[in-house]
């Protein structure tokens, strides 16, 4: 078995360097390193909790789209968010349990996934390329998700942005 004479030393050096970098990344703030504070535009616009936002979906044949929601296929639409219009955006119904719940209840209140860059690569809503609109069909208060996500955020747990 042919081995380089310094393989052990190289492996030890790589291991020590990895450990040092790990410690730096985990304790960066206590060592004086500051995290990037660059907020994306959608965080302050769409997820501003001081107001109620409007999201309007404009399609030529809404009824046909609703009838085919269970296929979970993207369809072209326009989206107007708080007065800002975005054309040639993709939308589809999302979910598994929620899709079957909507069907069982005889409702048309689907959850949707909006994809801004599905047809036009690079198109975003102030940096956001996908947006989920949840139907909250099993939440009569329509507040559980919002309250849990906000609570998780206050405790420092990674959670989706919500509004």
Regions found by a protein language model. Give the residues of each.
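Phosphate-handling architecture centered on phosphoinositide signaling
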Residues: 2-163
């Amino acid at each position: 078995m042919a081995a380089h004479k310094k393989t052990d030393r190289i492996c030890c050096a790589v291991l020590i360097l990895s450990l040092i970098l790990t410690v730096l990344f985990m304790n960066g703030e206590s060592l004086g390193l500051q995290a990037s504070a660059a907020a994306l535009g959608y965080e302050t616009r769409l997820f501003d909790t001081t107001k109620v936002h409007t999201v309007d979906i404009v399609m030529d044949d809404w009824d046909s789209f609703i009838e085919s929601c269970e296929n979970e296929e993207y369809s072209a639409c326009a989206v107007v968010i708080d007065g800002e219009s975005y054309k040639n955006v993709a939308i589809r119904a999302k979910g598994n349990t929620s899709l079957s719940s909507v069907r069982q209840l005889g409702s048309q209140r689907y959850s949707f996934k909006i994809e801004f860059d599905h047809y036009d690569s690079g198109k975003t809503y102030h940096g956001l390329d996908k947006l989920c609109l949840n139907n909250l069909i099993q939440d009569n208060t329509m507040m559980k998700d919002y309250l849990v996500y906000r609570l998780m955020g206050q405790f420092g747990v990674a959670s989706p942005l919500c509004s």
